[in-house]
A protein has these predicted regions:
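Bacterial N-terminal signal peptides that target proteins for export
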Residues: 1-7
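Bacterial Sec-dependent N-terminal signal peptides
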Residues: 3, 16-39, 155, 197, ...
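Bacterial N-terminal signal peptides
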Residues: 8-16
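Long, intrinsically disordered, low-complexity segments
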Residues: 19-20, 76, 118-121, 192, ...
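An aromatic- and glycine-enriched ligand-binding surface/loop that stacks and positions planar moieties
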Residues: 20-92, 202-203, 217-224, 229-403, ...
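Conserved, well-structured interaction surfaces
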Residues: 40-41, 45-49, 53-59, 64, ...
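Short coil/turn linking the two alpha-helices of tandem helical-hairpin repeats
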Residues: 162-169, 212, 230-242, 456-458
Length: 592
């Protein structure tokens, strides 16, 4: 069974480190549990479960999670060239619109909420660790494992903070709550923070068992996989002021390769047979899932259960059977990026060509233009295009499912939703809800991280090519989307090939890897962070913005500023709670 991420309200009332709507820095003990209870297995498990529960939102699974989505659709995709904000126009969730056009400041509420809730999550881990450290193995069963699990979770929360905000305060369970406001956010730089987090993951991996009795509980290979991710980020050495990538740390890259090999050698992971299985609940804890946030439905908590509230603003709107708010829409550039050449390989010159599948709506009829070029089949696994079959829904194809088509176009996101006729979808509000897990790390990541490390090392490029081709082969053998009116035909001219050995230089391999990461991981909350890690955010985003201005006037003032926009500003509220100790990230206005 899944590890349960739910807690009774009475326990929430006595947590010694609760969170309110002000700041994690302002917390005071709200109650206490006896030492006898807290140093028992049952008492410790309550604190451990609270730290796990924070993966889905530390205040529980409610609508408030929309303001700090754990899926990072706002912070990692709308901020990139992959997606538009969507919804009911630029004024609808204007704070996210500001992220999209690079016009954020330290007063942005979505940033303050994200910071606050991630630190609440860190605080839960510290609370559990403090109790676990003070107890003995005789008092608490599985004590060593629980300590390691909490360190992995804490490192996960800190990693999110680091890649979002750069300048962050770091404290562990040995720091008292009342001392939190006295810790500066520039005591450790990015490299030092990532070193700490990678070490925590490695130390935890030495203790954790290879398997756990409950699905969702952290084990050895989750820690190793996450260590690989952190070390891959750290390998790209950044200038502290400009955020430019100045060098590559080859020792760290070799460690990434070794860690990925250990995960693969475990024999427990593989790619799912069909890409579309990633969005089916039957496969959510299958062979591709390495680390996932576990969700549940109709479990007796909240209105629908511990569902993924992070994405519930994003269910298709308009006339769709989901009746949703229609946020988070795929960009035209992402659609175009799926075009392939005559060999089924990515068309690296797609931006110099007409838009693929651009739509016109006349009355109630859509016309899709320029649909003769070949495309990667993952396009229609990821994007809901007008007139194209939507999953297994038989009543009609994707149609007018976007709320503000004049601003954002006609395409919607197909990932992360179960088909509307499925019994796995919740009936009624919240719209489109299901208990589909959120994949933090999946096996495709392991393959692509290893390939990236090998390419940057300039070593064993052939193996890197084979790893990329593994991912492409899975897409090639997946069941293609069929024409809605004639299921004997494919919905598009799908063509995907494998990279040959000829011409596979380091430069070409790097471009191929980065394109593959985009196509395979589209809309999974990682794109913007990838661009920053690779040191290509300024060029990529300003080229994208220049093209978008032609069709979307709200991009008129948008501009990515190097040395600033790689990271979000430290929130103003948090500066106040630190008694003025925090320093702001480069390029942003001083705190007020």
């Amino acid at each position: 069974m899944k590890i349960k991420y739910m807690m009774a309200a009475c326990f929430m009332a006595v947590l010694t480190t609760g969170c309110n709507e002000d700041s994690f820095l302002s917390q005071k003990p709200q109650g206490s549990l006896s030492e006898e209870i807290m140093t028992s297995t049952d008492g410790a498990e309550l604190l451990v479960n609270a730290a796990y529960a924070a993966l889905g939102g530390p205040e529980g699974q409610t609508w408030s999670v929309w303001c700090h989505p754990t899926s990072n659709w706002t912070y990692g995709e709308v901020r990139s060239d992959n997606a538009y904000k969507g919804g009911g126009g630029v004024g609808d969730l204007n704070e996210v619109h500001r992220m999209e056009i690079f016009d954020v400041d330290a007063t942005n509420g979505f940033l303050d909420s994200k910071w606050y809730h991630l630190y609440c999550s860190v605080q839960r881990c510290n609370s559990a660790l403090k109790v676990l450290n003070a107890a003995t193995d005789e008092q608490i069963k599985e004590r060593s494992s629980r300590i390691a699990e909490m360190k992995v979770l804490r490192a996960h929360y800190y990693f999110e903070l680091s890649r979002l905000f750069n300048k962050i305060p770091y404290f562990d369970e040995n720091v008292e709550i009342q001392d939190y406001p006295n810790i500066k956010n520039d005591e450790f730089d990015r490299n030092e923070i990532l070193s700490k987090l990678a070490l925590e993951m490695m130390d935890a991996a030495d203790v954790l068992p290879a398997t756990q009795p409950e699905v969702g509980r952290i084990h050895k290979y989750i820690a190793l996989a996450y260590a690989a991710k952190i070390k891959l980020y750290q390998a790209y050495q950044q200038d502290a002021t400009t955020h430019a990538v100045t060098s590559m740390n080859k020792e760290l890259l070799r460690e990434v390769v070794t860690l990925c090999d250990k995960v693969t050698a475990s024999g427990r992971y593989d790619l799912l047979d069909d890409f579309q299985q990633l969005d089916l609940i039957a496969y959510e804890n299958g062979k591709e899932s390495v680390f996932a946030i576990q969700y549940s439905m109709n479990d007796g908590t909240e209105s629908a259960g511990r569902i993924n509230w992070s994405n519930l603003l994003n269910s298709p709107g308009g006339s769709s059977p989901y009746h949703g708010d229609g946020f988070f829409l795929p960009s035209q550039d992402l659609i175009d990026a799926y075009q392939t050449d005559e060999n089924g390989l990515p068309d690296f010159n797609y931006q110099q060509k007409p838009h693929y599948s651009w739509a016109e709506l006349n009355g109630d009829l859509f016309t899709l233009n320029n649909t003769t070029p070949a495309v990667d089949p993952r396009l229609d696994f990821v994007v809901g295009r007008p007139t194209i079959t939507w999953k297994t829904y038989k009543e009609g194809p994707c149609h007018t499912w976007v709320r503000d088509m004049g601003t954002y176009g006609y395409n919607c996101a197909k990932r992360f939703w179960v088909s509307p006729e499925s019994s796995d979808m919740f009936s009624g509000w919240p719209w489109g809800a299901s208990h589909l897990n959120w994949q933090v790390i999946r096996y495709a990541d392991i393959l692509l991280w290893k390939a990236e490390a090998l390419i940057e090392l300039g070593e064993d490029l052939g193996t890197a090519r084979e790893l990329i081709n593994q991912v492409r082969e899975r897409a090639r053998r997946s069941a293609y989307v069929k024409d809605f009116n004639d299921p004997s035909k494919d919905a598009a001219r799908y063509l995907i090939g494998l990279y040959p050995a000829a011409g596979w230089t380091q430069t070409y391999a790097r471009e191929a890897l980065r394109r593959e990461v985009r196509l395979e991981k589209a809309l999974e909350g990682e794109r913007f962070f990838d661009l920053v890690r690779w040191g290509i955010a300024e060029k990529t985003m300003n080229n994208y913005i220049a093209a978008e201005k032609e069709g979307r006037i709200y991009y008129g003032s948008a501009h990515f500023t190097a040395g600033k926009d790689e990271y979000y500003p430290v929130p103003n509220n948090q500066y106040g709670f630190s008694h003025g100790l925090y320093t702001q990230n480069p390029g942003y206005a001083p705190f007020k």
